[in-house]
């Protein structure tokens, strides 16, 4: 009854108006699952490759080739497979592609089938996707890292750092955390308006004001936290995504117009940690700068969460190599960086084995698909990045987490400060 009998893909649009792949997998029982693949703006060089048409349509960003690959070559390979064996399905897709980065069929084509199959199985069993992924142990609601000021490639402003996030880890429940974040977000909007700054938003729903420095952005956020009635560092902490590969060249980091070598970058980070309640730094060094990563990890790993995104690209092999080299203490998990659910789950398992925190993440080019909300709870990841408190493709994930919390009832647990305990001693 769980055999795949049909696979249908189509070209749809993501939150930036760019094409992406949506796939429906239909089972013999009549159950089906639909999944839409996201797309990133700042991408790691070793990410799995999303296939684009590179023709006149959509300025070269069409995905009709990927759609055709799903509807033809992939469909022929997976029709008849048992959908209850996610590993067999994903290995079939990996072998069919037969490249290291899924450049033949496209990671966007492969992932859409992988995700849709998992959702179809959950629907056949009549259980939520998170329960299918994690069973009876799936009950931890993640702490949200909410991107409320955008910079870098996510916004057209002078800020070098890509994301300024609030972390409501002092809440007792996920719903309380969401409320705290929303109240702070709207308070920040008022403060920016009062000070003459525009309140237009970037790709991920955060504001993109023309602030001149990292410190200025953080200070606005701290004022918003306090004015909303919360205590910075106690109720709500701050997290930053440097996306440092975007401003690293020839061994030098250029941040807000200032240049730093490896040691200077360390000093810059230490100064931020000493002056502000920062709990997490994502990609503070470039993926190309192993020594810089090692310096930061050696000096700061007991003080702050150091998250590898471009550094690890959700790739189990690359992640294990990075662990061996002493880089980072946490990993960002993005399904489309690696291209299958099975490989994603393998990477999460490695993180848990070696004591690395895991943060499930969206992409800047998102969709209404809520798969990552279920992945966060299903794997008890403890943290999620899914944007700001605006734009419906971001809110969709938060709303789904509210539904999951309600479904779990008294069994639901909010990850809270326990997720960051090593850095709060």
Swiss-Prot record:
Keywords from the named record: Cytoplasm, Glycolysis, Lyase, Magnesium, Metal-binding, Secreted
PROSITE patterns, per the entry: ENOLASE
Organism of origin: Hydrogenobaculum sp. (strain Y04AAS1)
GO term, biological process aspect, one: glycolytic process
Top-level taxon in the UniProt lineage: Bacteria
Binding residue positions for (2R)-2-phosphoglycerate: 162, 334, 363-364, 385
Subcellular location: Cytoplasm; Secreted; Cell surface
Protein name stated in the entry: Enolase
GO-annotated molecular function: magnesium ion binding; phosphopyruvate hydratase activity
Residues that hold Mg(2+) according to the record: 241, 282, 309
HAMAP family: Enolase (MF_00318)
Catalytic activity: (2R)-2-phosphoglycerate = phosphoenolpyruvate + H2O
